[in-house]
Amino acid sequence: MIRIINLRVAVTVKSDIKSIVEKKYPPLRGAIETIHVVRRAVDARKKPNIVFVYTLFIEVHNEAQVMKKLGKEKDVSVFAAEDPEPIVLGAKPLAHRPVVMGFGPAGMLAAFYLAREGYRPIVLERGQDVDTRSHDVETFWKKGIFKPESNVQFGEGGAGTFSDGKLTTRITHPRLHEISKYFVEFGAPEEILYKHKPHVGTDKLRTMVKAMRERIIEWGGEVRFGSKVTDLFIENDRIVGVEVNGSERIDTTVVLSGVGHSARDTYEMLYKRNVEMTAKPFAIGVRIEHDQAVIDESQYGVEPSSLGLGAAEYSLVYHDKESGRTAYSFCMCPGGQVVASASEEGGVVVNGMSLYARDSGVANSAIVVNVGPDDFGTHPLDGVAFQREWERKAYELGGSNFHAPAQTVGQFLGLSQAPSVQNSIYSYEPGVVNCDLHDCLPSFVTSVLERALPYWGRRIRGFDDPAVCMTGVETRTSAPLRMGRNEERISPTVGGFYPMGEGAGYAGGIMSAALDGAETAILCMAKYAKPN
């Protein structure tokens, strides 16, 4: 196989990729069997001359002869694709079916691989199926009626179901492409296999997770909604069963825990049951919203649809010399909306979401500042208490009815005659209240944001416009703790318990969580034979 990198093609060029390759590299004419687009990125650094930058895998006739004719082309090489390691099944007897806690990306992929290999997992998800859950979430947004077990955080697909559906990850692993191909099989757009910053969108994600659940069941797995694991049964420091909804017992010696970073009551239960965990850093801040046209103009210099481009994205970082902290944009959602994401009564949490089309006309992103155990304490659950404190203050500022506190950039920076939120763009439902965001965030966070906003305004024109709306608070950027696990991914303190995914502190997004779930299941299967 031949690999071509850095193939630069103007976005205005309409020729097919095969013709472009053959024109640039004449020895390939007539020799190409297949072309696979591995990656396509947008380079808009020299506006208005915007280009796609491709990486390609190409299968050809007479590869050695073609490479000889190509000579020393620096961007062309012979490439041997690395396949995922084959799955090897273990021999240790498994008297009961394995249990998977949670049906987000980690739990879903763990269950998928277990079911594919005949292990018939039992999935216990505290929330509801995606259709019921979507109705409950819409009711919460429109009417403020909150359901603590069916919301943006809990239910089929996990928190990622109500997000932009980003599939980006910094991890390189041969199984990632395999997982992406499964996602396409179940309804994700084929472009996720090659786009530099792939996304699915919350609308397509809902279809995809349902199809994956149906396949797990078809292969002998069981998926139970409204089923919260409320306790672990442990004998001689090993799992022997789980309690469901405070009453039912399911015997098992293997539990793969894919609970999310918002399952705080589950964290507390696991801590009481001696599952090893430590506090870890995360970040908190607010959501900021702009007219998408402002971001498009800054990033592309033109209206993106005229060039066949999607709504523009951004990624911003500010290193604060005064405090030593870092502020950064997080989970940027082009053409999306800010959503109410509470998972508990008495707290306001915001997040961002986009449909696949990203066509709302409004860009939003979290802008957050790093915090750590030095700020909130070293007890494993201190980060949870810290999050709750600021979520509660935001809830009270908003009127104790899940309306969110919001403030314009001008007000936040203390500018005279700054416009109010009522005259700005905001999308949070059930509503916002113009408040001082300094009252629902620690001063060491707000002071960094005050310095970061003008800095970012010099990089994206209009970013710090006084009329831009910010909504609080964003606290669930990542898990506030990490559960211990050994080289087999088993808890060192509770045998048979496998922490995995974002809630356990081992992932930071859909793809990394999915991969962690898959690889954890594969290691589990390498130890155990199929259950009777």
Describe the residue ranges of each PLM region:
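Residues forming the flavin
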Residues: 1-52, 56-162, 166-532
